[in-house]
């Protein structure tokens, strides 16, 4: 099964918080192919530094999370951020930005997913707004923070 992670879900694999157990189980399952958009690398670093600035993690935890991410990232399937993805994201923003509150970076993740996804693909996100738009688009979603 192919799982496409946005950054809100991916960060839970490298920092213990709500949803970490579910994300860890999904990533470690050898039957799953893990996909991310190239943008996730930059967003991930930004999310870690925000947690550091907010004193949620300390310097040691920051270093461990970054090194763990860099090692694990090399095992993921990475979809490049390119003009085709950007065009898809723009179309999604025009369709859902006003009515559903879809945001720029979320539109990029969904744009890449929509270009890649086939029947067995699942989008993994802890973002309720993005997850809702993914479902409206007709795809399956796993929110690791949901207890179901």
Provide a role label for each language-model segment.
Residues 39, 46-98:
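Active-site-proximal, substrate-binding regions of enzyme catalytic domains
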Residues 1-40, 51-64, 148:
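Short, well-structured N-terminal submotif of metal-dependent ribonuclease cores
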Residues 10, 40, 85, 109, ...:
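Alpha-helix capping/helix-boundary segments
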Residues 21, 46, 87, 131-132:
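Alpha-helical elements of the RecA-like P-loop NTPase motor core of helicases
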Residues 76-126:
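Active-site neighborhoods of divalent-metal-dependent phosphate/nucleic-acid chemistry enzymes
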Residues 2, 115-148:
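Acidic, PIN/NYN-like endoribonuclease modules and their adjacent C-terminal/linker elements
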């Amino acid at each position: 099964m192919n799982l496409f992670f946005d950054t809100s879900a991916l960060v839970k694999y490298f920092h213990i918080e709500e949803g970490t157990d579910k994300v860890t189980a999904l990533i470690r399952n050898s039957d799953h192919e893990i996909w991310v958009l190239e943008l996730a690398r930059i967003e991930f670093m930004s999310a870690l530094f925000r947690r550091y600035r907010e004193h949620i993690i300390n310097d040691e935890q920051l270093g461990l999370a970054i090194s763990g991410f860099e090692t694990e990232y090399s095992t993921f399937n990475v979809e490049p951020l390119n003009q085709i993805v950007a065009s898809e994201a723009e179309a999604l923003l025009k369709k859902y930005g006003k009515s559903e509150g879809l945001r720029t970076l979320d539109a990029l993740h969904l744009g890449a997913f929509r270009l890649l996804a086939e029947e067995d693909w699942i989008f993994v996100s802890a973002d309720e707004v993005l997850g809702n738009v993914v479902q409206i688009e007709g795809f399956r979603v796993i929110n690791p923070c949901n207890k179901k």
